[in-house]
Each structure stands twice: as C-alpha cells, then as structure tokens.
Amino acid sequence: MGQKVNPNGIRLGYIRDWRSTWYADSSRYATKLNEDIKVREFLHKKLAAAAVSKIQIERPAQNAKITIHTARPGIVIGKKGDDVEKLRAEVHKLMGIPVQINIEEVRKPEIDAKLVAESVAQQLEKRVMFRRAMKKAMQAAMKSGAKGIKIMVSGRLGGAEIARSEWARDGRVPLQTFRADVDYATAEALTTYGVIGVKVWIYKGEILPGQIAEKKNNKKGAK
C-alpha cells in the first residue's frame, strides 16, 4: 500500500544516531525538547546562507554542546571567530545555560540529502525546470560517489493547474535493507504557483554491524 516509514527514523539505534543526546526527568523532558526545537529553528533561520546539513545537541551536566554540520564553515565562523561567538551568546539566551558551539564541515555536499533537497528547492524558486534541476543533482551525486539517488517533487509543477508528483532515480536505493546507509531529507520551494515539496533519498553503501562496533570503539578510544 502507500504507507512508507521515514528512512532515518527506522534506522535509529542501528546505523543512525539521535540528533539530540541527553537525559531528562519526565517533568523536564517536554521543556528540553521544546528548547531543542527552538534552537534548531533559530540556527537554520540565522544560517540560511551557510548550507547547514544537521544540528546535533548534547547536554552534559548543566551545559549544552551544539555541533553544526555545514558545507560553508567560513560563513558560520566569520572573521576571527566573531560570528560564532555572537551565535553562542544568542543561543545561550535561548537555553539559559552555558553553550559550546562546534563547527564540522560537510566534505561532500553533493551526497548530503538535506543540502541536495535545499539546492533543488532553490532552483525551483528561481524557475529552473524541475527535470533539469533533478537531473543535475543526480549527476553530481553519482559523480561524488553515491551508489544511488532518488528525487521526488510534488506540487503544481511548471505552473500546471492540477498538482502532481514526479520522480527520478539513478542507481539503486534499497529502502527495506536496514544496514543500507540511506540518507533522507525534505525541503520546500515557495513558488508563485504555490509550495512544491522536494524529497531526496541518497544511498551511500552498506554499514555492517562489525563496522558500527569499530566506530563506537574508536570513539571510546578517542575519549
């Protein structure tokens, strides 16, 4: 039938880590979760030009550690780190606890589902034909080492009166295999004809249980 689970959610705890890592009592859980949502919304809005892929939030003791994964770290950091310090102060006001901000560069934005989805959405807003935008994104992803990619756009494509969905795929995208490293993200293009939704699936290969254990051991060794 038409029921499809979120590819990221179904892999949590298996080959995917949670975006927020902390513990809270039942009385404080909703408050902390709401803080995380507000912080992510604020950072995505503030760093709209920085190509932010994901934001990870950790809360060790009474502090917060935020890791921003971006394809343009220079925009986030600013000259001599001034911008990131201003950002830290603003996030501190939102959370009310000491905040540490780390920046990690996304080495291959062409195979990052979030960045690809936003790129396609931006092209649609600039009136680029949707098939051309999809084809260009797929070619760039396959050249950068992706094993497969699927892109779907939905809405009043090309200004048509009736909304429809179109999709294209290159390579293979095994959604049913849990060990398959499938990156999934969505974006929205705000056009004069209305909102066009963009969904992107990128298959990067398989992650075996032994490899996962090795990664965890490496992290422990680094600590």
UniProtKB/Swiss-Prot annotation:
Q: Which UniProt keywords apply?
A: Ribonucleoprotein, Ribosomal protein, RNA-binding, rRNA-binding
Q: Which InterPro entries match?
A: KH_dom, KH_dom-like_a/b, KH_dom_type_2, KH_sf_prok-type, Ribosomal_S3_C_sf, Ribosomal_uS3_bac-typ, Ribosomal_uS3_C, Ribosomal_uS3_CS
Q: Name one GO molecular function term.
A: structural constituent of ribosome
Task: Show the Pfam families listed in the entry.
Answer: KH_2, Ribosomal_S3_C
User: Which residue numbers delimit the KH type-2 domain?
Assistant: 39-107
Spell out the GO cellular component terms annotated for this protein, sorted alphabetically and separated by semicolons. Answer: cytosolic small ribosomal subunit
Share what the entry says about its subunit structure, partners included.
Answer: Part of the 30S ribosomal subunit. Forms a tight complex with proteins S10 and S14.
Q: What is the protein's name according to its record?
A: Small ribosomal subunit protein uS3
Q: Which gene encodes it?
A: rpsC
